[in-house]
Amino acid sequence: MKHCLVVDDSAVIRKVARRILDSLSFSTSEAENGRDALEQCRTSMPDAVLLDWNMPEMDGIAFLVALRKEVGGQEPKVIFCTTENDVEHITRAISAGANEYIMKPFDREIIEEKFQQVGLL
C-alpha cells in the first residue's frame, strides 16, 4: 500500500484529504506545517506528499526546497494543494520540484486524476 503525507495547517482539509486518499487505497499520515512534515520524511519517506502552500513555521515552498535538497531526485511525488492559483505560484512550485498542482477546493476526482498523472495510481 502506498503512503501519502498530507500537509496542511487546516485540520478540516487534512481530514477531507485523508478520507479521499483512504478511498484510493493509500495509507496516510499528516502534518500541520512544513517543519513537522520534514521531520516525518526524515523518519519514514512517503510515496507522496499532498502539500499546502501557506502554513506557519515552514511554508510549502520552503518544505519542498529542503526536501528535494535532502533526498535529491523526484521522490517522493509532491502535489501542491492550495488556494494560490496564479501563474507565479504555479511556476514557483514546479520550479522548486513539485510534480503537480491542485487548486482548492478539490474533490475525489481531481485528487485521483492528479495522482494518476504522476504515476501513483
Functional labels for PLM-detected ranges:
Residues 39, 61-74:
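Short amphipathic alpha-helix used as the core "switch/output" element in two-component signaling
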Residues 44-50:
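Active-site beta3 strand of CheY-like receiver
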Residues 62, 85-100, 110-113:
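Alpha4 helix (beta4-alpha4-beta5 surface) of REC/receiver domains from two-component response regulators
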Residues 104:
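A Lys-centered signature of the CheY-like receiver
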Residues 30-39, 60:
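Helix N-cap/capping motif at the beta->alpha junctions
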Residues 15-23:
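Charged docking surfaces used in two-component/phosphorelay signaling
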Residues 55:
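Receiver (REC) domain active-site loop signature in two-component systems and cognate sites
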